[in-house]
């Protein structure tokens, strides 16, 4: 039975299915018989959150413990948020409909910097104080994890616990400490946090003090409790085969952004693209065995009824057993009307065999990341792709019957000139011309080449963390020049808004002094900042001004190679010396080969107890 207030709210919103729960695959337990209740919160809409594979992994993992219950909560859309505030309806979980205050721990995934005000909105709707210092042991522990945890400093004051790295061992260890403390009784919040701080990869922001130089730079980040490490090393799963992919998903009532079965085939990446934060955060690369993946995929499709299976990773075509895996999948997938998709294909190892094995049921779109329009700039960013490889790949795709290709690029990259921008248009035009030069192309069919151009945002833990971000004026000028450089109606251009990218850059490299700004901006009506129709750029800029903070200080200035950064106390395996070396190679337009061909000494090897190449010897 729904609460009468909830029933009233559901009758007044556009998509009530976002908020009802009861989806196939949901886990229900007797809350009186469980020892730990964990609310997994995704700070965006239901449709976006239900596309997130990480939630599915941890949902199944935590619920595999008989005496723990993991439930889900999402950020309500504007209409539901207004109804909940009008009716005094607190934010609740999808399974039990209990408010977040009824849980032992409330966990947020940090996937995107522009979700930070949504986190405050969810805490506000739940009636939970924003700041960790204002919550004692009677409140749920507020936990964060995910890629943005690598510099959680702008929101560190809101969280009790921040997980660095991979959560499969880490999160159950946190829940185990919560369970132990509850059974003991009388354990203070500080004592519980001291225990949790001993778990590998756990960062307790309250146990660190930050001091600043007169010019605003970070001076030092130091522990303020005995036994707390000066640097926190990320948690890592050494052998992914020890954690089989989920074989059941909660199937959404309302179509998710990515509504399909998905299995993670590998983690990490060997490529070393200098702009790619994920490629550095998840080093070294580890893969699952083809036999394990095939069994998990078959069970997942059977349990959920999905007819599309995505082989997910940062670079799926680098899996050493990919051809074998596709052969195994194609033994059963066509019979079950399941199509296969590879969302992260590489231009330089795409083959006719690969395309044949992924189009036996129906064709899905092809997207390739060229990233830059000239070879010089591709060398700068270490995107080891040439025009010959792009030409070969598109030829294979067009001969196989494809008539649409999307090419991903970035603008605002280090050392970029207008010549590089023109190169984007020239590359797209060469793809169009290639299509019409092929005798095997589909007769009577035209080609569509889409340029998707993101604004480059320098991120922590990458060789480009030192570089300033382009100003909005510079990015808009480059966007205008790109549009003027495209002359074919066969080419469509999409590009990101430079103002949202600017705010993303501010939070990506920000520090704890931004927390009050985020709170004030939320109070002034800023949330869903990643949504164009909701983003209030002027409100943000006025808030920064009123609070005496210059946002450009964080993202539009060069960081010294020996400067203490807000994330200096976070160790993701790759050494500072390696990042500096790669930065200098970038300025010289020198490339670094993938690390499955040779170890370059990035430092991530110590996380596995041996050289990286020992763990990737079968990756070719």
Model-inferred region functions:
Residues 78-79, 154, 209-213, 320, ...:
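Flexible glycine/acidic-rich beta-alpha junction loops that bind and position SAM and/or redox cofactors
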Residues 1-27, 38-40, 487-620:
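Radical SAM enzyme core and accessory elements
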Residues 52, 255-291, 601-619:
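Canonical Radical SAM [4Fe-4S] cluster-binding loop centered on the CxxxCxxC motif
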Residues 7-39, 46-47, 205, 211, ...:
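N-terminal [4Fe-4S]-dependent radical SAM core
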Residues 38-44, 62, 250-277, 301, ...:
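N-terminal pre-triad scaffold of radical SAM enzymes
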Residues 76-223, 463-511, 519-533:
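Glycine-rich beta-alpha loop elements in corrinoid/cobalamin-binding modules
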Residues 67-79:
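A short beta-strand-loop structural module common to alpha/beta enzyme folds
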């Amino acid at each position: 039975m729904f609460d009468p207030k909830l029933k009233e709210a559901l009758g007044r919103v556009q998509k009530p299915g976002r908020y009802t729960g009861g989806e196939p695959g949901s886990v229900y337990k007797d809350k009186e018989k469980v020892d730990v209740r964990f609310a997994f919160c995704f700070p965006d809409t239901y449709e976006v959150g239900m596309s997130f594979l990480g939630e599915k992994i941890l949902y199944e993992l935590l619920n595999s413990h008989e005496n723990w219950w993991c439930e889900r909560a999402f950020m309500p859309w504007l209409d539901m948020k207004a109804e909940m505030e009008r009716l005094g309806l607190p934010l609740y979980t999808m399974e039990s409909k209990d408010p977040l205050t009824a849980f032992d721990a409330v966990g947020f995934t940090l996937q995107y910097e522009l979700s930070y005000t949504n986190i405050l909105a969810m805490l506000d709707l739940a009636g939970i104080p924003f700041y960790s210092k204002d919550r004692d042991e009677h409140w749920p522990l507020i936990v964060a994890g995910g890629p943005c945890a690598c510099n959680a400093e702008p929101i560190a004051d809101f969280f009790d616990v921040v997980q660095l790295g991979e959560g499969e061992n880490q999160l159950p260890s946190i829940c185990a400490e919560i369970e132990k403390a509850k059974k003991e009784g009388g354990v203070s919040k500080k004592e519980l946090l001291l225990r949790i701080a001993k778990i590998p990869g756990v960062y307790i922001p309250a146990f660190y003090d930050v001091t600043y130089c007169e010019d605003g730079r970070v001076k030092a980040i130091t522990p303020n409790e005995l036994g707390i490490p000066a640097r926190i090393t990320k948690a890592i799963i050494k052998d992914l085969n020890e954690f089989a992919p989920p074989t059941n998903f909660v199937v959404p009532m309302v179509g998710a952004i990515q509504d399909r079965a998905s299995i993670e085939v590998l983690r990490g990446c060997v490529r070393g693209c200098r702009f790619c934060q994920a490629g550095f955060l998840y080093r070294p690369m580890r893969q699952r065995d083809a036999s394990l993946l095939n069994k998990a995929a078959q069970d997942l499709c059977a349990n959920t009824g999905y007819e599309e299976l995505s082989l997910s990773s940062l670079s799926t075509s680098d899996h050493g057993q990919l051809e074998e895996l596709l052969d195994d999948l194609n033994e059963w997938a066509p019979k079950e009307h399941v199509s296969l998709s590879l969302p992260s294909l590489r231009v330089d190892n795409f083959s006719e065999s690969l395309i044949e094995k992924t189009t036996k049921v129906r064709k899905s779109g092809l997207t390739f990341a060229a990233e830059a329009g000239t070879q010089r700039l591709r060398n700068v960013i270490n995107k080891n792709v040439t025009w010959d490889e792009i030409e070969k790949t598109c030829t294979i795709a067009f001969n196989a019957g494809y008539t649409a290709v999307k090419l991903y690029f970035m603008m605002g990259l280090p050392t970029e000139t207008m010549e590089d921008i023109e190169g984007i248009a020239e590359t797209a035009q060469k793809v169009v011309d290639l299509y019409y030069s092929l005798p095997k192309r589909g007769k009577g069919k035209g080609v569509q080449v889409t340029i998707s151009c993101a604004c480059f945002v320098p991120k922590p833990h990458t060789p480009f963390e030192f570089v300033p971000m382009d100003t909005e004026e510079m990015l808009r000028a480059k966007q205008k020049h790109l549009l003027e450089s495209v002359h074919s109606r066969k080419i469509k251009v999409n590009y990101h808004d430079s103002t949202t990218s600017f705010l993303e850059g501010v939070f990506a490299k920000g520090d704890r002094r931004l927390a009050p700004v985020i709170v004030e901006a939320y109070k002034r009506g800023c949330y869903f900042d990643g949504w164009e129709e909701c983003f209030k750029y002027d409100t943000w800029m006025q808030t920064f001004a009123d609070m005496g903070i210059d946002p450009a200080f964080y993202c539009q200035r060069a960081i010294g190679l020996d400067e203490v950064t807000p994330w200096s106390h976070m160790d993701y395996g790759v050494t500072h010396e390696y990042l500096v070396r790669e930065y200098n190679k970038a300025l010289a337009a020198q490339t670094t080969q993938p690390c499955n061909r040779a170890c370059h000494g990035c430092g991530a090897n110590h996380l596995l107890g041996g050289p990286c190449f020992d763990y990737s010897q079968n990756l070719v």
